[in-house]
From Swiss-Prot:
Keywords: Cytoplasm, GTP-binding, Hydrolase, Metal-binding, Nucleotide-binding, Ribosome biogenesis, RNA-binding, rRNA-binding, Zinc
Subunit structure: Monomer. Associates with 30S ribosomal subunit, binds 16S rRNA.
Annotated TM spans: none
Biological processes annotated in GO: ribosomal small subunit biogenesis
Protein name: Small ribosomal subunit biogenesis GTPase RsgA
Listed GO MF terms: GTP binding; GTPase activity; metal ion binding; rRNA binding
CP-type G domain: residues covered: 77-238
PANTHER family assigned: SMALL RIBOSOMAL SUBUNIT BIOGENESIS GTPASE RSGA, SMALL RIBOSOMAL SUBUNIT BIOGENESIS GTPASE RSGA 1, MITOCHONDRIAL-RELATED
GO CC terms in record: cytoplasm
Function: One of several proteins that assist in the late maturation steps of the functional core of the 30S ribosomal subunit. Helps release RbfA from mature subunits. May play a role in the assembly of ribosomal proteins into the subunit. Circularly permuted GTPase that catalyzes slow GTP hydrolysis, GTPase activity is stimulated by the 30S ribosomal subunit.
Superkingdom of the organism of origin: Bacteria
Binding site for Zn(2+): C262, C267, H269, C275
Length: 310
């Protein structure tokens, strides 16, 4: 029997079958070993085949081919990956300029990974009602930067619902991953979009200006107007994986554009003579923050810095 994985609590997966039943399912032990290097071989959004047993639960026996997915390094194992979600129409990264701060390095790592796995991304800047003049200027700069690169951006105040109607229109009839740091307001947004779902919302640590985890598992939530939201635990750091050094610049759109003019085909854009990317940074044609994010991913390969909370 075929179905869609709509929830992952760690050891159990909820599979919604084609006839509308929700079946609690597990993976057989030997299934885990079949060329799967991720900590979670099955992800929310996967289409699977299950074998239902007499107790009413099931074993997952097959994962159908994915059209795409978003992946990051596992938080506890340096050589393993964690699949955040699969078979997405789009991802929305919830960003806050403050309360808590979302760094450009975090944003760019997420965008690069989405580019690598062909997942369209929109940036949604939340909590706009809380920003002072300095925060507002930073917000405007970020929107100008990412819009110029080609990423759609929007603003939102989940608390007052300003911008919520536009968000609903963007989500209609699509499977969307909602991601971002803990504390950026994902649970509040979902509570506004799906009345009655009653996700727990968390506070911001005043000492660290970071959010507390409120979502502890991944779940696909049906939207009233059609479509699904995939809610995942808030991410502190975003360690990239499965990218060869020579490919990383391909996932930074503006770097890739200028890299075609570099003197050497294998240019890493760090120090080589005749590097068009470095020249573009010096000329102000490529943002320094984006270039630093690119270098930080290269540094991952040499110094295993993925554990830092970017």
């Amino acid at each position: 029997m075929r179905g869609l994985v709509i929830k992952n609590t760690g050891s159990w997966y909820t599979v919604r079958t084609e006839d509308g039943r929700d079946i609690e399912s597990k993976i057989k032990g030997n299934f885990r070993l079949k060329d799967i290097k991720s900590t979670n071989p099955v992800a929310v959004g996967d289409r699977v085949v299950i074998d239902i047993n007499k107790e009413g639960t099931a074993f997952i026996t097959e994962i159908e081919e994915r059209k795409n997915y978003i992946i990051r390094r596992a938080s506890n194992l340096s050589k393993q990956s964690h699949i955040i979600a699969a078979n997405l129409d789009q991802a929305m990264l919830i960003v806050t300029v403050n309360y808590p701060i979302t760094t450009t390095i975090f944003i760019d790592r997420f965008l690069a990974t989405a580019e690598a796995y062909r997942v369209p991304v929109k940036l949604v800047f939340n909590k706009i009602d809380r920003y002072n003049n300095e925060d507002q200027r930073a917000l405007e700069c970020l929107i100008e930067l990412y819009t110029s690169i080609g990423y759609p951006c929007s603003t939102l105040c989940a608390r007052t619902e300003e911008g919520l109607d536009a968000l609903k229109a963007d989500l209609k009839d699509k499977i969307t991953l909602l991601s971002g740091h803990s504390g950026v307001g994902k649970s509040t947004i979902i509570n506004k979009l799906v009345p009655g779902v009653n996700l727990r919302t968390g506070d911001i640590s005043e000492y660290h200006n970071k959010g507390m985890h409120t979502t502890t598992f991944s779940e696909m939530i049906p939207l009233p107007g059609g479509g699904y939201l995939i809610d995942t635990p808030g991410i502190k750091g975003f360690g990239t994986i499965e990218m060869a050094d020579a490919e990383i610049s391909h996932y930074f759109r503006e770097l890739f554009k200028y890299s075609e003019e570099c003197r050497f085909n294998n240019c890493t854009h760090r120090h080589e003579p005749g590097c068009a990317v470095i020249q573009a940074v010096n000329d102000g044609l490529i943002s320094e923050s984006r270039y630093k994010s690119y270098l930080s991913i290269l540094d991952d390969r040499m110094e295993s810095k993925y554990r830092e909370e970017f």
